Structures are given as C-alpha cells and as structure tokens.
C-alpha cells in the first residue's frame, strides 16, 4: 500500500486563510512529502513558486463551495488556475441542476471543465451529504462518462463529510474507472485507513495534520 502521506491533500480552504497560514501549510507539505496542497485559487501562483523544488502538487477549487456558478464562469476559473500553475482542479457540480434531473447539463459542464484543465487532473465534488444513494450512483456514472479523473465526496461546507457508505457506493459503481477522494468524516486514523480500504485514493479532513502526527508517533 502507498505510504499514508501520499493519500493526503493537505488543505486550507478557510475564507480567512492568510498568506502566513498558506506558508505554514506549504512547509508542512514539504516536510512530510504530502501528495499536494489544496488552496484557494488566489494562492495558486504563490504556492506553485514556493513548491517549485518539491514533488508536492498544487490543487485548487472551482465553483467552490456551492457549485451554482454558470458553466462559463467555472471554465474561466479553471483556465486561470491552470495558467497560474495548478496541477489539480477540484470542481463542484451544480447539485440543484443534478437533483432536478438535468443530467446532460451536469455532464456537459464537467466535460467543459475537463477540457479547460488542459491535461491537468480533475476531481469532481458531488456533495454526498445532499444526495440519496440512488443519486450518488447516478452522479458517479456521470462522472465516469465525463472523462474526469476523480470523484470527491464533499466540500467541507455541508452538514457532513464523507461516510463509509458513500465510499463503498462510489467504489462499487465506478470500480477502477475513477479515483476517489474522501473529504471530511474522518475522525481518527482508523477512519482514514477504513476509507482507504473501502476504495479512497486520497483523503482530507479538518484535523488531518494532527492525525498524521499521531500516525508518526
């Protein structure tokens, strides 16, 4: 199994995050060789420069956290993020349109953003807390069709994060055709390891750095 550090997108998407906070995040990611840092779009260029001599990737978010921006806005955000050096894009679907049955709209939006990624990794945030099991299966199928690389459970701004059931349902639906990012819902190392066992390829939670230090000890 891959070392646990390579499952971690070290994240600070707080609206009050300062450059000092981002510096701290970056230095922790370098020290522990995490997979990536996940930060607001305005910090992408800054982080890319700070990480240029490391293997840590730069991830940012699009249409975040509510996902109801126009597709054209999300595409523009994506293009700018890629120009600024983003290696990975985490986009939020339009959950309302999806729940309304506008599947073609949702699929075409993901495809448009994937094209704007210009070869960079695309993760699709579906906000599992707001979906029924049947809806989760359907959106997983749409993400598979879109050409995206990952399906991601949550923004961290809804009432709950990932559950074991979410990960199991997504994995049973997509098999090896998509990678899975579990966001939130992880309270301890046992939870993180269970998410990985069920099929998660990346995980993130509010206290992930403390969990990582516990893992080292």
Swiss-Prot record:
Q: Does the keyword Signal apply?
A: no
EC number of this enzyme? 4.1.2.4
Which Pfam family is one of those matched by this entry?
Answer: DeoC
Q: What class of enzyme is it?
A: lyase
Subcellular location(s) of the protein: Cytoplasm
- What SUPFAM superfamilies does its record include? Aldolase
Keywords, ordered alphabetically: Cytoplasm, Lyase, Schiff base
Q: InterPro entries, alphabetically?
A: Aldolase_TIM, DeoC, DeoC/FbaB/LacD_aldolase, DeoC_typeI
- Put simply, this protein is called Deoxyribose-phosphate aldolase
Q: Which organism is it from?
A: Metamycoplasma hominis
């Amino acid at each position: 199994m891959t070392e646990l550090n390579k499952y971690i997108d070290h994240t600070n998407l707080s609206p009050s995050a300062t450059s000092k906070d981002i510096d701290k995040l970056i230095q922790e990611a370098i020290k522990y060789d995490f997979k990536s840092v996940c930060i607001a779009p305005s910090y992408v260029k800054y982080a890319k420069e700070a990480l240029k001599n490391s293997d840590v990737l730069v991830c940012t978010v699009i249409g975040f956290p509510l996902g109801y921006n126009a597709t054209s806005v999300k595409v523009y955000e994506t293009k700018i993020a890629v120009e600024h050096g983003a290696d990975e894009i985490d986009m939020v679907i339009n959950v309302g349109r999806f729940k309304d049955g506008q599947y073609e709209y949702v699929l075409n939006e993901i495809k448009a953003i994937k094209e704007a990624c210009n070869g960079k990794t695309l993760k699709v945030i579906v906000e599992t807390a707001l979906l029924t099991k049947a809806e989760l299966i359907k959106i997983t199928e749409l993400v598979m069709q879109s050409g995206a690389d990952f399906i991601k459970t949550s923004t961290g701004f809804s009432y709950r994060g990932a559950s074991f059931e979410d990960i199991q349902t997504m994995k049973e639906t997509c098999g090896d055709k998509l990678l899975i990012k579990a966001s939130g819902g992880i309270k301890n190392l046992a939870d993180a390891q269970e998410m990985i066992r069920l099929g998660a390829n990346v995980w993130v939670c509010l206290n992930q750095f403390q969990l990582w230090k516990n893992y080292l000890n």
